[in-house]
Amino acid sequence: MRAEIEALAQDIRRSAALLKRHLNWDEALMRLDELNASAENPDLWNDAGAAQKIMRERNELDSAIQGCRALERELADLAELIELGEMEGDQTVIDDAEEQVRALKERAAKMELETLLSGEADHNDCYMEINAGAGGTESQDWAEMLLRMYTRWAEKHGYKVEWLEESAGEQAGIKSATIRILGHNAYGWLKTESGVHRLVRISPYDSAARRHTSFSSAWVYPVIDDTIDIQINESECRIDTYRASGAGGQHINKTDSAVRITHIPTGIAVACQMERSQHQNRARAWDMLRARLYEAELQKREAAAQALEDQKTDIGWGHQIRSYVLQPYQMVKDLRTNVETSDTQGVLDGDLDMFMAASLAARVQGQVDQG
């Protein structure tokens, strides 16, 4: 086996060992046996909430255990295949197997990174709000570019995207939008994207072709299920109904059924306009508000994070997390981790994993450093 491939094999073995340590392997195997026994209990579904919790834990633990075993099994199979190819002098077999080792290394690295997603709500679906900053059409166009960037990222990772609210810009773009991203670890990955995003480019809306700086924000909070009890006093909320203001098309329900709920004590406001009836929009908006209040509580409990609403000051120079420069040169730079790339088009097409991974690792390291 060539030195390069042997080094990759060692990396895969290290990743598998780390994953096993993270799981507390022996304890994880015993816990899975317990969960499997519980799942076979005919009385399990007498308590639907408890049953869902058990089944969710079982599925996640089984997936993690099988993932570790698959790494070790596939690496052993590929090593045998390479050895066989070398014995028979079949370079095609060797080349194919080595390519599979490289792909396995990438998979192992991703699995290792996902061990960092251990927060209380990291495995949940999430809501994402995009809001344009000051600057009119420029910022509104940038907000729509951000929305496209995140939907492309979600599609590349096999996540489903639901549109909940969209407010069209005056000439182009959007003033705001809210989407729901459904998939395992959606919140864990996207929580690193909350903050202000800055764009520098030659404006397509400026006849003098001058360079403009625009700001838009992304705010992410987890979808919560019925096992998490968030009490809301309805007397502390204001409910408004209005006509949907989006541009129409597949995402917007153009009726008078849109609903906005404002939680007066915190100032948190949510809106939904995508369902067909006001009743449905109202129910979805209450779910969104519960999720926002839960996220605010999570932020208070996390030593490494500030309270969510304290972050939401004016969308401008403060609280920037990333800068996107398209002219006079091309560079996207994360201001928290200093990770950067000149592939601006790739980033705007949803290639965000390098930024998310670095930010997630830095956040976890910060929690370790703080105690």
Curated annotation (Swiss-Prot):
Chief location of this protein within or outside the cell: cytoplasm
Protein biosynthesis as UniProt keyword: yes
Keywords assigned by UniProt, alphabetized: Cytoplasm, Methylation, Protein biosynthesis
Record PTM N5-methylglutamine, positions in chain: 250
PTM (free text): Methylated by PrmC. Methylation increases the termination efficiency of RF2.
Coiled coil: none
Family (UniProt): Belongs to the prokaryotic/mitochondrial release factor family.
Primary role: Peptide chain release factor 2 directs the termination of translation in response to the peptide chain termination codons UGA and UAA.
Protein name: Peptide chain release factor 2
Gene source species: Paramagnetospirillum magneticum (strain ATCC 700264 / AMB-1)
Lineage per the UniProt record: Bacteria, Pseudomonadati, Pseudomonadota, Alphaproteobacteria, Rhodospirillales
Gene: prfB
